[in-house]
Amino acid sequence: MKCPYCSSAQGRCTTTSSGRSITECSSCGRVMEERQTQNHHLFHLRAQDTPLCLVTSDLQTAAQPSPEDEEDPFEPTGFITAFSTWSLEPSPIFARSSLSFSGHLAELERTLELASSTSNSNSSTVVVDNLRAYMQIIDVASILGLDCDISEHAFQLFRDCCSATCLRNRSVEALATACLVQAIREAQEPRTLQEISIAANVQQKEIGKYIKILGEALQLSQPINSNSISVHMPRFCTLLQLNKSAQELATHIGEVVINKCFCTRRNPISISAAAIYLACQLEDKRKTQAEICKITGLTEVTLRKVYKELLENWDDLLPSNYTPAVPPEKAFPTTTISTTRSTTPRAVDPPEPSFVEKDKPSAKPIETFDHTYQQPKGKEDKQPKFRQPWLFGTASVMNPAEMISEPAKPNAMDYEKQQLDKQQQQQLGDKETLPIYLRDHNPFPSNPSPSTGISTINWSFRPSVVPGSSSNLPVIHPPKLPPGYAEIRGSGSRNADNPHGDF
């Protein structure tokens, strides 16, 4: 038999105060095994053969007239015959049986008795609190796979804390979990606070609160290197199935970061995770951020931030005689983890939209012009912001007041209509420069009715010829009126009865 606490193979049999038989360890004195003995009252049936003697005379008697029966065993033959009786009688037997099982309950009883004897109060409340704390510590320790020495030390811390402070209105389970965290740190076991919180079903904030209470009650100090890189790194590398070279490189990077204070705002677990990811990049190990975060309990955002901080000093992180499997320029070019592009993109002006893109109808209206170029009425003296009025098909810059009513950018049909109006205006010319009798002249007359006797004369207007230019087309100038005569008004047509156009 082997002791589950100290692994000793020597034990001795003894009896508890309640009369139970146990086997305790000779080295540590803890209960290894408990035996339960039971007496059994049995009866054994034994066969008993009792002789019965019957004596008969040897003399022959007178012959009887009864018929002879040769098969009769009781027929006297004249000799002495011995008879016996056979029977089954129960005989009592005193037997004892023994049942052996684990000694956890007996160890719990021994621990509670020891706690009750050392405590100042022997009330039932203290016993119940000790029982709850012991069960909490044992359950969490079994889930995390901790040694029995750690759980025993945690329960001792709980008893000392109960003696030093009051547990009224406080959670016994949270205090027991805090005692287990302190025992784990003193034993330098690689267990994170997040793992303990999940196993104990207690929030990390609550555990931290009771760790502070425990430290104030027992005047405890933080153990040296209880949460260092060397504690967590081997466990993380083992769970990630990394080889020895990657593990040594990650440990070296983490220790350099801690010693040179490159990441002062980060805890050792975050630094360990980032160092593992950096070592995997240099050793060409295919480990994703999600895999590392699942093992270490971090988020991918935190991992990327710490990794970015490590890259700022990556020249000082690597050993002097180390040759990476992947060159650092390829392993981590000066970029972020999530993208291969530079973090500060070059400032390039957006290209101007082409004329064809302006004509393309868009399925979704663009409201850029409404918000960008919208100006209140009464401020028409200000120059509009856009520089390309020809894209809208107008001869001059549009009035900002007109742009307020425009819901969206003009499409291709509006542009063609504006171009047609522009051509007509160029052909008609500016009417303000014409004489009054030619302003109402229509250069594109409709078809005259053949039934009317009115003859129509078309006055075609031509711009003045530039001197020096040769042209074969005749130029018709409007007649000049002498001073003092009223201006002749007409529709551009003359009648034979009224040659001067008088009304």
Swiss-Prot record:
Expression across tissues: Widely expressed.
Gene3D superfamilies: Cyclin-like
The organism's place on the tree of life at top rank: Eukaryota
The species this protein was found in: Arabidopsis thaliana
Pfam families: TFIIB
Membrane topology of the entry: Peripheral membrane protein
Amino acid composition bias (Basic and acidic residues), ranges on this chain: 355-366
Record-given protein name: Plant-specific TFIIB-related protein 1
Recorded name of the encoding gene: PBRP1
